[in-house]
From Swiss-Prot:
Compartment(s): Secreted
Gene that this polypeptide is encoded by: igf1
Family recorded in the similarity comment: Belongs to the insulin family.
Basic and acidic residues composition-biased segments: 140-161
Protein's name according to its UniProt entry: Insulin-like growth factor 1
GO terms for MF: growth factor activity; hormone activity; insulin-like growth factor receptor binding
Segments for region (Disordered): 115-176
Ranges where the record places region C: 74-85
Gene3D superfamilies reported for this sequence: Insulin-like (1.10.100.10)
Length: 176
């Protein structure tokens, strides 16, 4: 083996070890950076959702179903929580997970009720018989009386639908 070949092989080995050192140094610095960012993120503490941010997140999670501010009956063991707690108590004063937010979504409507009127063909709609104007005025009076005196014996649940007046979120990310 000539000295030229020996020098060429030796130089190649030097470059390989130099590349290995650079690669190891680069990997080590990248690892330190990731560890620093991870510990800073976990040290920031739990994230809470309050006010408009809570409402926006609930609208995002629940979608068209809507949501309740107080938990509907039948969710979770009642012995663990007091009965007057709601989503604000659970997510504004302490951090809450996605599962907790989903508990406040309104139930999914049945397939027939959720079907859009626009999706129906116009021939699917039954024709209503014409009614005389005298009967219509009596019906409207009954409707007014019913609206003025709602049945107070039935419990009412207030479902909050998506509020389109809040504006477009513009692709805003939601924190959980």
């Amino acid at each position: 083996m000539s000295s030229g070949h020996f020098f060429q092989w030796h130089l190649c080995d030097v470059f390989k070890s130099a590349m290995c050192c650079v690669s190891c140094t680069h990997t080590l610095s990248l690892l330190l950076c990731v560890l620093t960012l991870t510990s800073a993120a976990t040290g920031a503490g739990p994230e809470t959702l309050c006010g408009a941010e809570l409402v926006d997140t609930l609208q995002f999670v629940c979608g068209e179903r809507g949501f309740y501010f107080s938990k509907p009956t039948g969710y979770g063991p009642s012995s663990r929580r007091s009965h007057n707690r709601g989503i604000v108590d659970e997510c504004c004063f302490q951090s809450c997970e996605l599962r907790r937010l989903e508990m406040y979504c309104a139930p999914v409507k049945s397939g027939k009720a959720a079907r859009s009127v626009r999706a129906q063909r116009h021939t699917d709609m039954p024709r209503t018989p014409k009614v005389s104007t005298a009967v219509q005025s009596v019906d409207r009076g009954t409707e007014r009386r019913t609206a003025q005196h709602p049945d107070k014996t039935k419990p009412k649940k207030e479902v909050h639908q998506k509020n389109s007046s809040r504006g477009n979120t513009g692709g805003r990310n939601y924190r959980m």
